[in-house]
């Protein structure tokens, strides 16, 4: 594995262990050339997935992009990184086991919305504001109002 700091191709694995949910192997690596230490993750990829954008363009599925979008929505919210990672792993497993190789971006967005809806309502609204392309304050008001009316009485 190439060192991300100096580019040396000869790095050493110092420690390997499964992640908490056993979905990946976490490896601590050391670069003898520059002395840097870094972590890599090895994950099973069941199939190559392609995301079909709303305009018809296609791009390879990027787990890190999905993770970044969820982290942005959950920024400064009381949800730990491991929980976010488990949700992303769950979404990826669902996509890979669907049998489809081309996945509409709207399907991924809906899956994220479902998970965020149960995880954190503020993050849910944040994500929805981008996913549903809110343009005015009234768009937020209408969306939040639907959350209130759809919520069970308590």
Swiss-Prot record:
Zinc finger (unnamed): 3-34
Compositional bias of kind Basic and acidic residues: 11-22
A biological-process GO annotation: negative regulation of DNA-templated transcription
Region Disordered, residue ranges: 1-22
Cofactor note: Binds 1 zinc ion.
Function: Negatively regulates transcription of bacterial ribonucleotide reductase nrd genes and operons by binding to NrdR-boxes.
Protein family (similarity comment): Belongs to the NrdR family.
Entry protein name: Transcriptional repressor NrdR
Naturally occurring in which organism (per UniProt): Rhodospirillum centenum (strain ATCC 51521 / SW)
Top-level taxonomy: Bacteria, Pseudomonadati, Pseudomonadota, Alphaproteobacteria, Rhodospirillales
UniProt gene name: nrdR
């Amino acid at each position: 594995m190439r060192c991300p700091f100096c580019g040396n191709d000869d790095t050493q694995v110092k420690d390997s262990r499964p992640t908490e949910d056993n979905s990946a192997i976490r490896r601590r690596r050391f670069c003898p050339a520059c002395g840097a230490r870094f972590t890599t993750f090895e994950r099973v990829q069941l199939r190559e997935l392609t995301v079909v954008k709303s305009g018809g363009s296609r791009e390879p599925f990027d787990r890190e992009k999905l993770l970044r979008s969820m982290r942005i929505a959950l920024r400064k919210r009381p949800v730990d990184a491991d929980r976010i990672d488990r949700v992303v792993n769950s979404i990826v497993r669902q996509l890979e086991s669907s049998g489809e190789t081309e996945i509409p971006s709207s399907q991924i967005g809906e899956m994220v919305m479902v998970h965020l809806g149960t995880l954190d309502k503020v993050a849910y609204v944040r994500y929805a504001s981008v996913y549903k392309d809110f343009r005015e304050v009234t768009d937020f008001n209408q969306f939040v109002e639907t959350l209130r009316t759809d919520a069970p009485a308590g």
